[in-house]
Amino acid sequence: MTVPETLHRIPRRPWRWLPWLLLSQLAVVLAWWAWGWAIGLPLMVASHALFLVPVFLPNSRFYAPVLSHLPAPAGHVWLTIDDGPSEETPAVLDLLDRYQAKATFFMVGERAAARPERVRQVLARGHDLGNHSHRHPQTRFWRLGPAAMADEIAQCQQTLTGIAGTPPRWYRSVVGMTNPFVAPALKRWGLTRVGWSARGFDGVDCQPQAVVDRIVAQLRPGAIVLLHEGAAHGHNLAIIEAVLQAIQARGLSAALPLRPLSGAHPPIAGGSSSPATPAPTTR
């Protein structure tokens, strides 16, 4: 599987936020010195919030570029499935085959190492892989330091590469959180961060129909759809099938991006090349 260069968003300046952090703290010090704590303290809180809030915004590009929507070639969406491989993976693959759909599976390194045959099944059925961290530390991913973050991304990348034979080129943050130390690791491994534009919150305990309704409301050509497998609530297979049915009912198809020929617009797997279109939204 190759990656279209027009979609590849490797961070070029992973520390670009640092000068702004230093300037903001200098402004806080000067304000505190000039006007006292009544001005300095609120300014300090605001300056810290400015750098903390983007960590929790899945499609924020404050710390790293993000691909949140594809160019809109007629009739296609990008289906992405997180948190595998799991015991449900074969059933997910059967559903995708039934609806003639392709997906990118964002896999957790530890789980891939425990079920390498599932990873190979995904590839053998014509789907793609993405890096979704090695241990999926969802409660503390947002506060991992540089060494721990680098290790999470590196170990997953090495594990998936060892099983698949080729390195993944896509990355998705755990719960979409991206702190200042994600971008350096992405640059190191040549990874593009992928967000989403259609999400139903199926990774946690949920009402399946409510999840499907939320996703369907956001379905449009070029959408990046976020789904999960193997969640404890046991509804993922039903949700995936309902979303696949909705995609077909809307006259859409789930397909993977391919590398275009030189100077050509990136086609879609199973589709044909089309005229040049604007670059993807990266927000």
What are these regions (language model features)?
Residues 89, 115, 149, 153, ...:
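Aromatic/hydrophobic pocket-lining residues that form the small-molecule binding cavity
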Residues 93-106, 127-128, 146-177, 184-189, ...:
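CE4/NodB-like, metal-dependent polysaccharide N-deacetylase domain
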Residues 216-261:
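Catalytic grooves of carbohydrate-active enzymes
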Residues 177-179, 183-218, 251-263:
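His/Asp/Glu-enriched short active-site or ligand-binding loop at hydrolase and phosphoryl-transfer sites
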Residues 53-141, 152-155, 159:
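Active-site beta->alpha N-cap acidic-glycine motif
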Residues 81-83, 107-109, 131-133, 173-175, ...:
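A cross-domain feature marking catalytic cores of carbohydrate-active enzymes
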Residues 83-87, 106-116, 139-145, 172-180, ...:
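Acidic-and-aromatic substrate-binding clefts and catalytic sites of carbohydrate-active enzymes
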Residues 2-78, 86-94, 98, 243-244, ...:
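N-terminal pre-catalytic segment of deacetylase/amide-hydrolase enzymes
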